[in-house]
A protein has these predicted regions:
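N-terminal subdomain of nucleotide-sugar transferases
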Residues: 1-42, 70-72, 93-100, 172
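Short aromatic-enriched loop/helix-cap "lid" or pocket-rim segments at secondary-structure transitions
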Residues: 18-19, 46-50, 90-91, 113-118, ...
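Short amphipathic alpha-helical segments and helix-helix/interface helices
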Residues: 25, 66-69, 88-95, 160-167
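A short, charged, and often flexible helix/loop element on the N-terminal side
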Residues: 39-66, 78-81, 142-155
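Membrane-proximal helix-turn-helix segments that form the acceptor-binding/catalytic region
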Residues: 63, 109, 120-172
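An aromatic- and histidine-rich active-site surface loop
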Residues: 78-99, 103-137
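Helix-loop-beta element that forms the nucleotide-linked donor phosphate-binding surface
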Residues: 164-169, 181-190
């Protein structure tokens, strides 16, 4: 039987993606041997979590993933959300182990956080239809999170590196709509 490892970083507040993933795990379990690996974004940050903000590679998460891979030996890794606790190092590990990667694109965060300057995020009307972001200056910093420049900077760096990972490593992208499909095609080389 094909083994599927579902990987997700749970949001602090339970939301649509988290509910969707649990539902999918149930459905997948009817046809495959499934293991669910969940990372949690909590307020209780450890030393390596702070480092991972800058490297986008979480040492503890990588260690956890390697142990699960050794114990479970999946054929497929089905990735939902890696922001930020899972980190981007998991793509390299999965690629090195020759595990097929499926990446589900749930929302438009990648598009909204792909640039440092707000003019590359918003339309000519200074408004983003995808996330509701409003900017009065097209040359201002792309403050994706209204309450934090730092969190916005970290999100932008993460998204830019995730887009590089999508381009670098072989994976199948599961998009929710044609807009996302076309958006991600511009980054995918294969």
């Amino acid at each position: 039987m094909t083994k599927v490892l579902v990987i997700n970083t749970k949001y602090k507040n339970f939301g649509g993606e988290d509910a969707n993933i649990l539902e999918e795990v149930g459905i997948l379990s009817e046809y495959f041997e499934v293991k669910y690996l969940e990372f949690t974004n909590s307020s209780n940050l450890k030393f390596f979590d702070y480092i991972s903000f800058f490297t986008n590679n979480n040492r503890n998460s990588n260690k956890t993933l390697k142990k699960v891979l050794d114990d479970f030996s999946p054929d497929i890794a089905y990735i939902h959300n890696t922001w930020f606790r899972a980190g981007l190092g998991i793509y390299k590990i999965l690629n090195e182990k020759n595990i097929k990667i499926l990446f589900k694109l749930h929302n438009f965060r990648l598009d909204c956080t792909k640039s440092y300057i707000s003019k590359n995020h918003i339309s000519k009307k200074n408004f983003c239809l995808k996330c509701g972001y409003i900017s009065n200056s097209s040359f201002s910093f792309n403050k994706y999170f209204n309450d934090s420049y730092f969190k916005s900077l970290i999100a932008i760096r993460f998204s830019r590196k995730l887009l590089k990972s999508i381009s670098k490593f072989p994976m199948t992208i599961l998009a929710l709509n044609n807009f996302q499909k076309e958006f991600i095609k511009s980054y995918k080389k294969d």
